[in-house]
Amino acid sequence: MKSSKLFALAGVTLLAATTLAACSGSGSSTKGEKTFSYIYETDPDNLNYLTTAKAATANITSNVVDGLLENDRYGNFVPSMAEDWSVSKDGLTYTYTIRKDAKWYTSEGEEYAAVKAQDFVTGLKYAADKKSDALYLVQESIKGLDAYVKGEIKDFSQVGIKALDEQTVQYTLNKPESFWNSKTTMGVLAPVNEEFLNSKGDDFAKATDPSSLLYNGPYLLKSIVTKSSVEFAKNPNYWDKDNVHVDKVKLSFWDGQDTSKPAENFKDGSLTAARLYPTSASFAELEKSMKDNIVYTQQDSITYLVGTNIDRQSYKYTSKTSDEQKASTKKALLNKDFRQAIAFGFDRTAYASQLNGQTGASKILRNLFVPPTFVQADGKNFGDMVKEKLVTYGDEWKDVNLADSQDGLYNPEKAKAEFAKAKSALQAEGVQFPIHLDMPVDQTATTKVQRVQSMKQSLEATLGADNVIIDIQQLQKDEVNNITYFAENAAGEDWDLSDNVGWGPDFADPSTYLDIIKPSVGESTKTYLGFDSGEDNVAAKKVGLYDYEKLVTEAGDETTDVAKRYDKYAAAQAWLTDSALIIPTTSRTGRPILSKMVPFTIPFALSGNKGTSEPVLYKYLELQDKAVTVDEYQKAQEKWMKEKEESNKKAQEDLAKHVK
């Protein structure tokens, strides 16, 4: 579910009935096979787990390629390709023993080779040579890797990864990272067979070619058809096949138009689980007939947001009619008071209700980029630490609630006050009003269009259409993705405001969120803020992002005291919140579903590619014949939480055994 954690905005909706008709039912087949049928929303542009930065790829490859460790259903790190591991007492050297029964297989299930320690070395070298989008995860962590990527050293053997023998791979870090093992679930640290890689050349990991990959995971990819379907089959020779309970997985593409279809397809057996849309015309009737089966899932750690393009270069999709309007919009977005007016004037409960309905709107709301309960120290959640820092930025933050599941930002009076300050300053710069803000949206995705329309309504009502106009650009899905999610560089980011992306954490540390928009090296500055990192960007300087980077860097340099580290990251998050450069909106989960998945059997994690809160990982997943009831779910949740606490405690105690 999480490739480097860049997500296209979820909540799109259902596939056409004709598409689903081709899929088998969600129960057992005539041969007694278990089939899981679900949906997907975004086609991958490749299957290259070593270089990608997109969830569209990882949602597929994380089911077919295993790394060193994975998550169990309680979120613990358990053996995968590594049957054992150790860390040196100084925290700088991690050593993993590769299991002897780990094999590579073709897409047809034929054994190709054993998985060896050298495969992990080959994988990282390939990622470095190809300038992987996910290098940010490890480039400054592994000794010598940054120098190799920058060309300061040419010999990869000088990088801190070694195959000590066929079964042992060792990593040497620049500084201790208590969360290092959580990074091993990510594709950039996964193995690849060198002989196969060389044989495929540029055809390695093609988007629609299952034969362009080798498989060492629980499933084999059998077919992938753009805007149609993805199919997996259980790997019969997988070393841990007893924990693979679903024989086939069939995913169908959603086009986002008919929001009544998911429930219909669940009821007729076409889907094993269905995301529900309370704003659909049929939901009221569904509540009457299946009220005991409508379950709201837990909020996860993925944060969707609205980004601000502070350095827009392209204007193919725009309602602006003059260079003066373009210049005025850019000056406005560079003004913090203006951005805060947007943040405070945006009714995010109304926005979320377009997806989750009035009753469920609050269940997905989020106020911080880093979720407030993501980490804890000294008895305080991360959100509490941020609040202590945030109030020092001004009175506007004193009564703001940063907890999940409520809108702590929306305040029309604050919005008007901030806008008044901004307008006075901007008029002195010759800015023309109203400010026109282009916001692209997939015109075929009903709930996406409704959300953007809701944002337009609340902002224009609060700030006045004579001051701010949201110009909705309704485009084809591919057009929207190509100028947001899939844009190759900042020049392709053709928007002023965008809610088309989100971020999920790669590992268990606040840096996994906050590093990604550092102006010098952040991988998502173009996606969220409209400029390419690594440049001496004038707009980034204007909004103070280099000051933000200093805060993040200082936090990252604290490697001995976790409480101090988190406190420093809280200071960086407080700066980011005050800047209003990105406006968090919702989590991915916390939404109503109908399901025949046995509750809490999928692998769980708040970060990484091997744990999820959504049905995008299929190892461990178990199915039942009838729809889960609310009572069953609540009892299972209570039982799982108790078991999780006990299991996590034992896992923490067992860590001492790995220090050598």
Curated annotation (Swiss-Prot):
Effect of T30A: In strain: R6 / R800 and R6x
GO-annotated molecular function: peptide transmembrane transporter activity
Subcellular location: Cell membrane
Biological-process GO terms, alphabetical: peptide transport; protein transport
Keyword Cytoplasm found: no
Phenotype upon changing V246I: In strain: R6 / R800 and R6x
N-palmitoyl cysteine: lipidated positions: C23
Primary role: Part of the binding-protein-dependent transport system for oligopeptides; probably an oligopeptide binding protein.
Name of the molecule in the record: Oligopeptide-binding protein AliA
Native source organism of the sequence: Streptococcus pneumoniae serotype 4 (strain ATCC BAA-334 / TIGR4)
Gene: aliA
